[in-house]
Amino acid sequence: GVELDVLVSNAGVAPPRARPTRHGLDEIFQVNYLAKFILANRLLSEGILPNATFAGNGRPAGRTPRIIYISSDSHQGASAIDYEEFGVYYDYGVRKSINMYSYYKLVLNTFATELARRLQSEGQVDVSVNVMCPGPVNSNIARDAPPVLKGFMKLIFSVFFRSPEKAARPVSYLTASSEMEGLTNDYLHMFNRKRMDEKVYLPEEGKKLWAASAAVWRRVDPRAGTYLLSDD
């Protein structure tokens, strides 16, 4: 009987090289994107995030549930989604890892846009889905950096990057502000609204990504069909 009003999805890693998960997938792919796809599917299909679209337990106007994805403006200009290699594990090093971080932020934002589309009908928002970039944050995301760089990066982070408390303020706004009631598919760079990379908004990309994501997880989890939402 548990219901959530808000889901803030923030998990992310920045490993210095490719690392396989126990499912045989790339860690940055599984943590930074696929886990968020699976979690949203499960919470929506089971009505834990109340919605009329998939679970038939939608909230009345003025009480719209909210999903907020923490992303990065580094997605701007990232490579288009490669569906031939989507979900395929292969080895790479530090330089490619930086590109992969930005790439999977583009993937995440494309998914968020498609999810927002599916959760509204004829101008009525069933569940709002918004994305934000907190800017540079003094966090431990570089904890796996090579030892020779870790101390230097820690110094740079502490001097020039925002504290987690300041970085969380736009998240609190998206979570609780009455100004955001019923608004969906917005992107905030800190507190500033802006456009995401234009590739994110292509409807055919969103549909292809949804189908590809579901296919990857069905190969891993034989129970996936019980909670993954329709590919349509």
Show where each model-derived region lies:
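A glycine/serine/threonine-rich, flexible loop-to-helix segment
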Residues: 84-85, 138-155
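Short, hydrophobic alpha-helical segments
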Residues: 47, 175-179, 217, 221
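C-terminal, well-structured subdomains that either form a transmembrane helix-short loop-helix hairpin
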Residues: 128-144, 160-170, 202
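Rossmann-fold NAD(P)H-dependent dehydrogenase/reductase core
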Residues: 1-140, 227-228
